[in-house]
A protein has these predicted regions:
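Conserved DEDDh/DEDDy metal-dependent 3′-5′ exonuclease domain
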Residues: 29-142
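Helical catalytic core of nucleic-acid polymerases
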Residues: 136-139, 155-162, 277-398, 402-403, ...
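Conserved "right-hand" nucleotidyltransferase catalytic core of DNA-directed polymerases
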Residues: 145-154, 160-308, 391, 399-424, ...
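C-terminal, non-catalytic extensions of nucleic-acid polymerases
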Residues: 274, 426-640
Length: 640
């Protein structure tokens, strides 16, 4: 099916909707040079047109087997506005519905508001749609800012009763831009998300239109034939160990720790195997030391000991699958097929599609069982799986330390253990892995790590065997992309993080890295106000303030007359200001399309020292070095 993007703008006496169809050549659409030409193909419908309702419904409903109607947050807003127009409401009534969506408390403002209230939750029916906010968060403007698009907004007051032709033209211009932004965001980020959903539909015989309209979790529930159910043990806390792992766990974990996990859901931290080990709803996490550097050498090596498909495996081996799935064999068959296809040579396209579908089902099922709004909801089985996973993996970590001389656990996470061990003892580690697998039926993998700079369990830089660099956490996040996820991260002056990574991994001079970087996006930072704040201002050096958009993109400027950016709210009758975190003291807005800037001109205003000083902050760490079992302080990574 083809994608038809749309977006509404609503004012007291006038509404507007823009439709834009995805070009047949998607590479043409993603090339920003073609943005003006693409926008020229968009169709405008507004309430001034004598047959506006019929035109709107025609574009929404005609050829519904050909076009998927797509947009951002359309379930919560645009489809509701479309339904209000479909009901024959006049622009004033459509605005009331709009206001109730945005501020539900306004439903009690007038009798007409009360009458319109039920329609603030009713979507237009009988169409196939894809909401780009599904399995995501944040606003469209945030996505536009991160992707480098123009994030300027209309200055027209949406509560203005009598719009001029210039006002309408302005709203039309920005509405077209948001439709193009949805198209661009789909191609850059969400296309793979939709493709994966369609793969599930193809494999499990789910109608294509249902695939578009469902979130991943809802679609997986359909694939597994799950039926929402209630269970008498929803409030039960205590869990019991499966017979096959009971002896192993009690032999390799202190009984007090094991029973605390088994009989309580409260998070707690203990010291085991020289780690601070934290147990909680997010799984088990531990570190040997924060701010730790370790590298492999001829005698010692870093080794990742991972449980393969840990949570899907536990759902099968420990019988933790949501009981809303009437036939557990369906899940096991999917798991077995994925393993078989993973090792198959010369895969066909159908094999690849099956792999995609199987992976999505396996990786979504556990999390969906803990969401009370989903058909897979089974809270007892969800907490049981999580806590069994913590117990069994920690038991292995404890046994490794007790049985392998000198082995150090560098960190544990939800499905793996990073250990530092003598190379001659690797066969013993593998033997203990095999024992763990034999007891449980869960396979284990391992891979070699060359180096790790570990700030804490959630922030580290790692070089794997072969030179592949892995980053986790915000400390050295250097891209908006999140591989394996269809989410994007804010811009945080990536130039600094990239320079630090090059310094640590290659020894490249930080200043040289910063100066040589000509990617304008790497110098940008995004900042937003958040729902609890009323607005955003920039306060200049002379004390004046200028109101800004809710979401902005900035960089560090040499111009000292430029000031900080603040978000503000009313607190006990007074305005309360808070500085935007991690934003330059003197910053300039860069809310226009980043491709419209000339970097040679841009760099004349760029305060390079800000980014160099950020590097200093990122490297302001007293590193510990674990070398052949000995721990010492090292200054080998000092730069400043």
């Amino acid at each position: 099916m083809k994608m038809r993007f749309f977006d509404f703008e609503v004012t007291p006496n006038w509404w507007l909707c823009i439709f834009g169809d995805m070009p047949d050549d998607e590479s043409y659409a993603i090339d920003r040079v073609n943005e003006p030409a693409i926008k020229d193909t968009f169709v405008e419908i507004n309430s001034d047109m004598p047959n506006a309702r019929d035109l709107l419904i025609s574009l929404m409903k005609d050829n519904d087997d050909v076009y998927v109607k797509a947009g951002y947050n359309i379930k919560g807003y645009d489809l509701v506005i479309a339904n209000a127009i479909y009901q024959g409401f006049n622009p004033q009534q459509v605005k009331i519905v709009n206001d109730i969506i945005i501020n539900p408390a306004s439903a009690y403002d007038t009798k007409e508001h009360l009458r319109m209230q039920p329609f603030a939750k009713r979507r237009l029916r009988g169409i196939c749609y894809q909401d780009l906010l599904d399995d995501n968060d944040g606003s469209l403007k945030e996505k536009e800012a991160i992707l480098g698009l123009d994030i300027m907004e209309s200055e027209v007051d949406f509560n203005k009763e009598h719009l001029t032709e210039e006002d309408k033209a302005d709203l039309t211009y920005y509405c077209k831009h948001d439709v193009y932004a949805c198209m661009y965001y789909f191609l850059k980020v969400m296309k793979g998300y939709v493709k994966n959903k369609l793969a599930i539909g193809k494999k499990f015989g789910i109608a294509e239109r249902d695939c578009y309209m469902c979130t991943n979790a809802n679609l997986v529930a359909k694939a597994l034939g799950a039926k929402r159910s209630s269970f008498g043990d929803e409030e039960l806390i205590e869990i019991f160990l499966p017979t096959k792992i009971r002896e192993y766990c009690y032999e390799n974990l202190p009984n007090k720790v094991l029973d605390q996990i088994r009989t309580s859901t409260k998070p707690f931290t203990v010291t085991m195997f020289d780690n601070e080990v934290s147990f909680g709803n997010g799984g088990v996490h531990s570190v040997y030391k924060n701010n730790l550097y370790v590298e492999s050498n001829d005698e010692w090596m870093l080794m990742n000991v991972d449980a393969a498909s840990y949570y899907p495996s536990m759902l099968i081996q420990f019988e933790c699958l949501s009981r809303a799935v009437r036939n557990p064999a369906v899940f096991k068959n999917i798991f077995d097929e994925r393993i078989a296809l993973k090792h198959k040579k010369n895969k066909t396209q159908d094999d690849e599609d099956s792999q995609t579908a199987n992976k999505l089902v396996l990786n979504t099922t556990y999390g969906a069982s803990g969401n009370k709004y989903l058909d897979l909801y089974d809270p007892y089985m969800c907490t049981r799986c999580c806590r069994l996973g913590q117990i069994f993996l920690t038991a292995l970590a404890n046994k490794l330390v007790k049985n392998v001389n000198g082995l150090k656990v560098i960190q544990t996470n939800t499905d793996g253990i990073l250990v530092y061990v003598r190379r001659k003892d690797v066969p013993l580690v593998r033997k203990l892995q095999d024992e763990w697998s034999k007891v449980s039926g869960i396979n284990m993998d391992y891979d070699i790590v060359e180096k790790i700079w570990q700030r804490d369990v959630n922030n580290y830089l790692m070089i794997k065997e072969g030179g592949k660099v892995k980053r986790k956490g915000l400390w050295l996040m250097d891209t908006w992309e999140k591989p394996g996820y269809f989410l994007i991260s804010p811009l945080t002056a990536y130039a600094s993080q990239k320079a630090v990574i090059s310094y640590l991994t290659e020894g490249k001079d930080i200043v040289k890295s910063i100066i040589e970087n000509t990617n304008i996006m790497d110098f940008m930072m995004t900042c937003k106000k958040g729902p609890s704040y009323r607005g955003v201002v920039q306060r200049f050096e002379d004390g004046t303030e200028v109101e800004l958009f809710k979401c902005n993109r900035v960089y560090a400027s040499k111009d000292k007359s430029l000031g900080q950016i603040y978000k503000y709210k009313m607190y006990k009758g007074n305005i309360s200001y808070a500085k935007m975190p991690s934003i330059p003291e003197h910053c300039r807005l860069a809310n226009n399309d980043l491709e419209s800037y000339d970097f040679n001109e841009f760099r004349k205003d760029l305060d390079y020292m800000f980014y160099i000083e950020r590097c200093a902050d990122l490297l302001d760490i007293q590193w510990l070095w674990l070398n052949e079992g000995q721990l010492s302080i090292t200054n080998r990574f000092d730069y400043f």
